């Protein structure tokens, strides 16, 4: 995704404000067996999930296409003393991945799957998942559940004003997000706007845009089934509550059919 290549240095710091991102990995870890598992994380980014999975004793392969994100992940891994043998980081296109090995678990977190906005792209990713799972393996997918009142609105909105400090750049960055929705296409255009001040006090700006789709629970189940994956369980939040109409998340554990 282009935005991650553009602002990788911001990524961890801008997301510290999101409380739910402190709960998704612990919830996943509670469902992994205690004995070491072979785990493939697709779109691992800066290692936010891959590193704690490896620290818990699992053997993790993290894949991402953004070289700068992987650079930060390697720096964090090495600083924490996590062995490259326990956490291997690869630059690959996750929709065309061929590792010639299979895993106990394949995971896609943090709404990443929604960045694949066409049926063809979604099918390609799910085929990759199926091809890399061992018989009886598990697929873990975590996306937000669509908010129908928001989906019905085509107007642009500006949300999430915030500020964060980036130590590597010695810079405080001010951020807000523009969102434009097209319910007829189930698409959402998201633009992140960043502003900071240079050493002369002059404002500098950066903007990056990407599209995501909306997927409803039944749609997701159909997508999984037509790609050889059977849903074992669905949750609606990280407290383990079942998926319902008002649930904020769609968390799925599936396995090869």
Which residues does each PLM region occupy?
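Conserved class I S-adenosyl-L-methionine
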Residues: 1-45
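Class I SAM-dependent methyltransferase SAM/SAH-binding core
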Residues: 50-96
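A short acidic, Gly/Pro-enriched loop at the edge of an enzyme's catalytic core
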Residues: 98-105
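A short glycine-rich, Lys/Arg-flanked "PGG" loop and its adjoining helix->strand segment in the class I
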Residues: 123-135
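Conserved beta-strand signature within the Rossmann-like core of class I S-adenosyl-L-methionine
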Residues: 136-143
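SAM-dependent methyltransferase
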Residues: 143-221
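C-terminal lobe and adjacent flexible extensions of AdoMet/dcAdoMet transferase-like proteins
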Residues: 211-257
């Amino acid at each position: 995704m282009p935005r991650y290549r553009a602002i990788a240095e911001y990524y961890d710091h801008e997301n510290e404000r999101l409380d739910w991102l402190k709960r998704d990995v612990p919830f996943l870890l509670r469902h992994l067996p205690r004995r070491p598992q072979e785990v493939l994380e697709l779109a691992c980014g800066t290692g936010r999930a891959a590193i704690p999975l490896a620290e818990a004793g699992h053997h993790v392969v993290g894949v991402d296409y953004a070289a700068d994100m992987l650079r930060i992940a390697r720096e964090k891994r090495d600083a924490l003393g996590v062995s490259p043998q326990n956490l291997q980081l690869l630059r690959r296109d996750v929709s065309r991945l061929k590792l010639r090995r299979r895993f106990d678990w394949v995971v896609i977190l943090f709404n990443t799957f929604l960045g694949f906005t066409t049926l063809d792209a979604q099918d390609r990713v799910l085929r990759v998942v199926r091809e890399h799972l061992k018989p009886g393996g598990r697929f873990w997918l975590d996306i937000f559940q669509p908010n129908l009142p928001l989906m019905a609105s085509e107007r642009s909105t500006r949300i999430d004003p915030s500020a964060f400090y980036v130590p590597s750049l010695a810079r405080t960055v001010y951020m807000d997000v523009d969102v434009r929705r097209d319910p007829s296409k189930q698409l959402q255009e998201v633009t992140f706007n960043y502003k900071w001040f240079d050493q002369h006090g002059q404002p500098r700006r950066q903007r990056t845009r990407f599209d995501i789709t909306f997927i409803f629970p039944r749609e997701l189940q159909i997508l999984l089934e037509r790609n050889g994956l059977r849903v074992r369980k669905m949750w609606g939040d990280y407290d383990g509550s079942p998926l319902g109409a008002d649930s904020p998340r769609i968390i799925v554990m599936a396995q090869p059919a």
